[in-house]
Amino acid sequence: MNFVQNTPIFNKINISNIQFRSNPAVYTGTFEPSKDSFITYPNTDINALAQSARTNPKIAEILAEYKIPFKFNSKELEKLQQGHLKDTRLVAAKMYSALPDDLKSEVNLKDLQEAAMFHDYGKALIPEKILNKEGKLDKREKEIMELHSELGYELLKGVGVNQNVLQMIKYHHQTPDGNGYPIAGDDFSPSIGAQILSAADKYSALREERSYKPAMRKEEALKILQEDVKSGLIAPEIYTALEKVV
């Protein structure tokens, strides 16, 4: 079932009756993805990923179109693994634990956690001067930054990651109203897992210090996401699960 604003599922849940489920099934330990127990792909180490990037013709095509020189930034990837990806995975797994049962049944928790740990891997191919720019990105830089979803999809497709995880990675910046990226067509709607990942990703990013902004307090981050609900960018049930666990 797809989870979009114009479907009955938005109206079938009494949000006030959603009960918080404590102790989500989250693995804690070393955060190198190839070593996490819930990740079943042996070829997600840095060397295998770099080789996948070099030999993928679609990645070469995307980089050539935007005149981006090939560079696999392993240091940036390692930084993401230890910080933002770990944080996003923990938030996403906790959000899953707070969903009502009928929505939980639409999500594979292991796949969700893998997608959260992999979702920004495409940034290893984004030029560092854009990725860590202190000021606002211009139009061209923004277009290049937005390539990371599709680049991550292609990168991880090359090491055998399953399609459910890949779809969440590719479309974690898609929105229920169809205004996200990459362009997916009028009849596309992001899965519940992708929407959980999107909200967890944005919340984690807002709470972190970045080169272009200071870290936000929890209340500030939630207020921004509340506005996203009003704008149709986040489904109310997804936001409620986030609010309950943070």
Give the residues covered by each predicted segment:
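Histidine/acidic-rich helix-loop-helix segments that form or flank divalent-metal centers
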Residues: 112-116, 156-158, 163-197, 213-214, ...
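Acidic/His-rich, divalent-metal-binding segments that scaffold phosphate/diphosphate chemistry
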Residues: 28-146, 157-159
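Extended charged
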Residues: 1-2, 201, 236
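An active-site-proximal "capping" alpha-helix that borders the catalytic cofactor pocket
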Residues: 87-95, 144-157, 216-234
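Short, charged, surface-exposed loops that flank catalytic or proteolytic processing sites
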Residues: 136-137, 210-218
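His-Asp-centered metal-binding catalytic motifs of divalent-metal-dependent phosphohydrolases/nucleases
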Residues: 107-135, 152, 167-181, 197, ...
